[in-house]
Amino acid sequence: AKLDETLTMLKALTDAKGVPGNEREARDVM
């Protein structure tokens, strides 16, 4: 469940910024 919340948050951040590259960086940090 915690992972789901994190993925949802990352998606929201990516959608808000509109920068696809951000998702890759976030995954590396995870």
UniProtKB/Swiss-Prot annotation:
Signal peptide location: none
Cofactor: a divalent metal cation
Keyword Protease: yes
EC number: 3.4.11.-
Cofactor note: Binds 2 divalent metal cations per subunit.
Keyword terms: Aminopeptidase, Hydrolase, Metalloprotease, Protease
Enzyme category, top tier: hydrolase
Temperature and activity: Highly thermostable.
Highest rank taxon of the organism: Bacteria
GO biological-process terms attached to the record: proteolysis
GO MF, one example: aminopeptidase activity
Record family assignment: Belongs to the peptidase M42 family.
Function per UniProt: Metalloenzyme of broad specificity, releasing all N-terminal amino acids.
Subunit structure: 12 chains of two different but homologous types, alpha and beta, which can combine in various ratios.
Protein name as annotated: Thermophilic aminopeptidase 1 alpha chain
